[in-house]
């Protein structure tokens, strides 16, 4: 979940699972699995907690992540402002045995790139009965994966997990008393990459 302030905002317990496999039957094909849980807590459901599990495998690399989200809402007459925190652990590893090594003396092969890093994120979410908007950064701690290897002035010396910023906004249209349409926009900003814009209809 990219917006920690959203946990528990739906007013009921939610469990979501997603599994995605690309290029089936191809060795080293990307595989992604996510499982998330969130629920409202507190006397007036003004708080929420969530738990997310994430695994991603591509070729010789694997990434495992577990995060906990907490949200606290301030209720107004016609709206609600929610602040969210995210904390967790991320594990990144490379299995060089799955590669065809041309040079056993390659310094990159001799380097243990396996890393366990903390994650910490923030989010703000504002919503009414008609519209909502929010901003978040799921992880504000940058990770340099090859910082301990003396390979300056190479492409590997710049391999890092940079901070991702997300902006979201949406509006609720009542088509009938029982049917609602929720078009939304999600913007993703990362330093050094083009701005990404997604339109979502719910």
Regions found by a protein language model. Give the residues of each.
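Subset of outer-membrane beta-barrel
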Residues: 1-201
């Amino acid at each position: 979940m990219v917006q920690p302030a959203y946990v528990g905002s739906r007013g009921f317990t939610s469990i979501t699972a997603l599994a995605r496999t690309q290029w089936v039957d191809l060795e080293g094909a990307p595989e992604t699995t996510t499982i998330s849980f969130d629920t409202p807590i507190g006397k007036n459901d003004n708080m929420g907690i969530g738990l997310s599990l994430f695994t991603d495998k591509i070729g010789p690399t694997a990434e495992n992540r577990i995060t906990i989200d907490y949200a606290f809402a301030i209720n107004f007459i016609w709206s609600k402002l929610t602040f969210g925190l995210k904390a967790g652990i991320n594990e990144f590893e490379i299995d060089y045995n799955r590669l065809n090594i041309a040079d056993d003396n390659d310094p990159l092969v001799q380097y243990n790139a396996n890393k366990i890093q903390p994650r910490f994120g923030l989010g703000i979410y504002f919503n009414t009965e008609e519209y909502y908007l929010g901003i978040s950064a799921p992880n504000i701690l940058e990770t340099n994966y090859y910082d301990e290897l003396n390979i300056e002035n190479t492409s590997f010396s710049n391999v890092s997990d940079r901070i991702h910023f997300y902006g979201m906004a949406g509006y609720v249209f009542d088509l009938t008393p029982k049917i609602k349409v929720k078009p939304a926009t999600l913007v993703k900003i990362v330093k050094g990459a083009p701005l990404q814009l997604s339109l979502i209809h719910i």
